């Protein structure tokens, strides 16, 4: 069940609350066990959601989940304040350092990484044209909610808090979270970067990974030496429900502490490459073909695949020749056929090995590499285990045999023009020879 908290101390929250009640069929109920200002009194229910109203600002509502009956996810409908113009934003709550705005020092609420990703997608669908959308770092209370939670905010000033379209967009985005699982196995804790977490926002928009707690640069400054902040760093993973981190910037001391605590630092490349690919398959591919961070790339067939595979080396001469003709086409060929393939030069050059779902895919990939040669050779054919390429080219030896020595006439002939030698015409066809290259595989 989705729990929704509205605060009477927040005009944007009240506005969003009114929009929520207008956008769904709610039934009105009375809770006489709790004080009206603590979520009791009149409250509202609709399909898979319940809305309660509190007097205090959200940031001071520790334990808010206790007002609801076993919520899976709790959303604080809130204003956002800042110099950021029209903005819809969301984030997990708690404090990496001192609790200046609710919650406790070094205390983090249970994050909802999958719900954060879902509401970020909903923002894109529902936001008015003049609004930006995004996420923020973890930066205020409450830090003890009682279930997975996040703030969903309308900002960034009075004009937006009173904006009907903006409030409706937030309300629709909140309602879209009904039935959404709060957590996902594919989650990272974020460390570093600015308050509005552009790198971690990119993770949500460009990959299928979720983002839990985010400690921005200023939070890490408050923490000081990461060796002295091991407890709160560990809490960030526990409260995010993950063992993985993404670090923005060069922070070797922090990464050392993360790894010493038993967690793993991933790269953004890893998150992008593994999108849609079962992590169990990723692990096996890296074991056989090398790490993604060392150049392994995952092809289209890896999406959703978790079966067996074979590993093969590509024929060196054919691969070198094809890369020399069009390395982009070679990458595209490998991407279309292979589960995974090795690369060099920052991922731009396919070099092998390749992992294939079936042994027959090896020949398919060779055929694709042979097709790349078509732009350089006059004909390319495959016989048994050999790619045979033919190309008609100017032969200097034939030109000299025809009496054309080095000089202007030689240059004209090599460029495709006929020349006269002692009253005889020598044509380009006279001095061209078909050359053959054979590539074994």
From Swiss-Prot:
Top EC class of this enzyme: hydrolase
Keyword Protein transport among UniProt keywords: no
Keywords: Hydrolase, Metal-binding, Zinc
Co-factor(s): Zn(2+)
Reactions catalysed according to its record: a D-aminoacyl-tRNA + H2O = a tRNA + a D-alpha-amino acid + H(+); glycyl-tRNA(Ala) + H2O = tRNA(Ala) + glycine + H(+)
Pfam families on file: tRNA_deacylase
Swiss-Prot/TrEMBL GO biological process terms: D-amino acid catabolic process
EC number(s) reported in the record: 3.1.1.96
Free-text cofactor note: Binds 2 Zn(2+) ions per subunit.
Top-level division of the source organism's lineage: Archaea
Molecular functions per Gene Ontology: D-aminoacyl-tRNA deacylase activity; zinc ion binding
Coiled coil: none
Subunit: Monomer.
Role of this protein: D-aminoacyl-tRNA deacylase with broad substrate specificity. By recycling D-aminoacyl-tRNA to D-amino acids and free tRNA molecules, this enzyme counteracts the toxicity associated with the formation of D-aminoacyl-tRNA entities in vivo.
Family: Belongs to the DtdA deacylase family.
NCBIfam families named in the record: PRK14866.1-1
HAMAP family with a match to the protein in the record: Deacylase_DtdA (MF_00562)
UniProt protein name: D-aminoacyl-tRNA deacylase
Organism: Natronomonas pharaonis (strain ATCC 35678 / DSM 2160 / CIP 103997 / JCM 8858 / NBRC 14720 / NCIMB 2260 / Gabara)
Gene that encodes the chain: dtdA
């Amino acid at each position: 069940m989705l729990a929704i908290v509205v605060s009477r101390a927040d005009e944007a929250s009240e506005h969003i609350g009114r929009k929520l009640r207008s956008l769904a069929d709610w039934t009105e109920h009375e809770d006489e066990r709790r004080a009206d200002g603590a979520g009791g009194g009149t409250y509202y229910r609709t399909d898979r959601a319940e809305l309660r109203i509190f007097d205090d600002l959200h940031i001071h509502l520790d334990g808010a989940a206790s007002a609801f009956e076993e919520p899976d996810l709790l959303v604080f409908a809130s204003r956002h304040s800042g110099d950021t113009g029209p903005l819809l934003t969301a984030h997990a709550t708690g404090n990496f350092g001192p609790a200046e705005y609710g919650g406790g020092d070094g205390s983090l609420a249970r994050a909802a990484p999958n719900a954060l990703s879902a509401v970020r997608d909903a923002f894109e669908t529902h936001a008015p044209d003049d609004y930006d959308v995004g996420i923020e770092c973890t930066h205020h209370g409450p830090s003890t909610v009682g279930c997975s939670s996040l703030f969903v905010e309308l900002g960034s000033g009075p004009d937006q808090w009173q904006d009907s379209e903006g409030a409706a967009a937030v309300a629709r985005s909140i309602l879209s979270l009904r039935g959404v699982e709060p957590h996902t196995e594919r989650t990272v804790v974020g460390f570093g970067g600015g308050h509005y977490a552009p790198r971690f926002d990119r993770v949500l928009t460009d990959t299928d990974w979720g983002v839990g707690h985010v400690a921005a640069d200023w939070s890490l400054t408050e923490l000081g030496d990461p060796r002295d902040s091991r407890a709160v760093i560990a809490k960030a993973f526990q409260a995010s429900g993950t063992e993985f981190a993404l670090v923005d910037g060069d922070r070797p001391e922090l990464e050392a502490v993360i790894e010493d605590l038993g967690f793993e630092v991933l790269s953004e490349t890893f998150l992008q490459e593994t999108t849609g690919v079962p992590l169990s398959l990723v692990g096996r591919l890296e074991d056989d073909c090398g790490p993604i961070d060392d150049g392994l790339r995952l092809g289209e067939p890896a999406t959703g695949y978790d079966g067996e595979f074979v590993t093969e080396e590509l024929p060196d001469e054919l691969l070198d020749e094809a890369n020399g003709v069009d390395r982009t086409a070679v990458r595209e060929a490998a991407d279309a056929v292979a589960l995974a393939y090795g690369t060099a030069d920052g991922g731009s050059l396919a070099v092998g090995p390749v992992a294939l779902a079936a042994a027959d895919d090896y020949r398919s990939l060779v055929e694709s590499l042979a097709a790349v040669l078509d732009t350089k050779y006059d004909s390319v054919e495959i016989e048994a285990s050999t790619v045979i390429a033919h190309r008609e080219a100017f032969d200097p030896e034939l030109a000299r045999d025809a009496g054309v020595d080095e000089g202007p006439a030689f240059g004209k002939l090599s460029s495709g023009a006929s020349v006269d030698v002692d009253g005889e015409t020598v044509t380009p066809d006279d001095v061209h020879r078909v050359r053959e290259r054979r590539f074994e595989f």
